[in-house]
Amino acid sequence: MAVVSKKIPAPDKVKIRTALLSVSDKTDIIELATVLSKLGVKLLSTGGTAKAIAEAGLAVTDVSDVTNFPEIMDGRVKTLHPNVHGGLLAIRDDAEHVEAMKAHGIEAIDLSVINLYPFEEVRAKGGDYPTTVENIDIGGPAMIRASAKNHAYVTVVTDPSDYPALVEALQADDGQTSYALRQRFAAKAYARTAAYDAVISNWFAEALAIETPHYRAIGGVLKEKMRYGENPHQSAGFYLTGEKRPGVATATLLQGKQLSYNNINDTDAAYELVAEFLPENAPAVAIVKHANPCGVATGPTLAEAYRRALACDSVSAFGGVIALNRTLDAETAEEIVKLFTEVIIAPDVTEEAKSIIARKPNLRLLAAGGLPDPRAAGLTAKTVSGGLLVQSRDNGMVEDLELKVVTKRAPTAQELEDMKFAFKIAKHVKSNAVIYAKDGQTAGIGAGQMSRVDSARIAAQKAEDAAKALGLAEPLTRGSAVASEAFYPFADGLLAAIAAGATAVIQPGGSMRDQDVIDAANEHNVAMVFTGMRHFRH
């Protein structure tokens, strides 16, 4: 049964007379406490925060003196007391509440400045189970939620970045806060505790290998408010989930303006793709536009890999995102600045390369500090009307699969390498996806078509266009391997690839008409392998 409100009007201005400060992150807390003290505010605090305030020479009352009860159980119990929560939750204009405060000696608390145990940091660093559990804050969220609920009278601050706004308000208005400010801080407080609990609940799900928990919470902290979303009429923000996976969310912007919504989406797609190619094996470059690759290649050098990737579709690469699996060097930078590019992301960047990229001040340059592990577990989420689709990350690797030769002719060693190369890329192309590859270089990419035949034909046409632009006698699809991210439901898609010049095929298999497709491959002396793993991407 719902609780009925007494509907007592909230005051606009509330004078801050007593403040409770209890923080794990002590950034600027002494400066804030100093301002509060000068305004005549009585300071209450706990543990390490109280010690820091006292050492700064400020008068502070330990919460244990308010509760008349010591901290116990290694600090697990210190603020969970009626004298604290009564002071936070009391409705100051309710006669019954005021009488209860007098009867039990409860002092009103007008301001709570609280941040939480660093559970996210401990989890990210891979702390052991007991240590991680010990860093689940109990008293902090309880006080935050109590303060936020009673924002009609209590100001709650959970983020050091909000201290300046609080100080400005207090100094401008004789130590008072407005209802609008208290309401805004309360909304942020509930968002903070929700995100905190989301990380905890997801950690438990991972620890217990619960793939589909009954409740799924996804939380994040705003990294930046964006100018707009996918289109100018859409609002957008970029949130960090706390996952320490190298990529666009954790990368350092070395130069260039703020990334747009579409830049972030494309950069993530590009970097996840190029990470499929281990840097110790060969330099690799991926060029992405609208979250689909328009060219991918390996090479003896990073610069050569870039040139080979660009050759696949230099027209579509204009205004694209370039991802590298090795440190960006000067030679590669000189090649990249020849063409208009939106974003470059690499594990690192040499000083010489930075100087070269600086010639293009609007070109965004990101250093990610490493490559994401393509085999690592994780989650992806997508909203639908009234719901949320959550699935495990597609971390299947072709190197880990048992490839089954299903045709009379087995692939040559080079064909097999090209098959694997193409199948890695197919995983990152919107379905239906068809990729032609030869000698570690994409020859043509067909993406996002409703018909697999159309994807094969588009990829072949792209290859012909590239051949003409490069002055080649024939497209690179001649003698290429072709990859399909899902099975061929009919032989027509395979025949389209064969018509383009493919001599080897890699696909998951699993169609009711697999034998028809195998027969067509045998008829044209084409080698084909089944992976047994599909890579739909929508």
From Swiss-Prot:
GO molecular function terms attached to this record: IMP cyclohydrolase activity; phosphoribosylaminoimidazolecarboxamide formyltransferase activity
Occurrences of domain MGS-like (ranges): 8-158
Gene Ontology CC: cytosol
Residues annotated as signal peptide: none
The protein's name: Bifunctional purine biosynthesis protein PurH
InterPro entries referenced in this protein's UniProt entry, alphabetically: AICAR_Tfase_dup_dom_sf, Cytidine_deaminase-like, MGS-like_dom, MGS-like_dom_sf, PurH-like
Intrachain S-S bonds: none
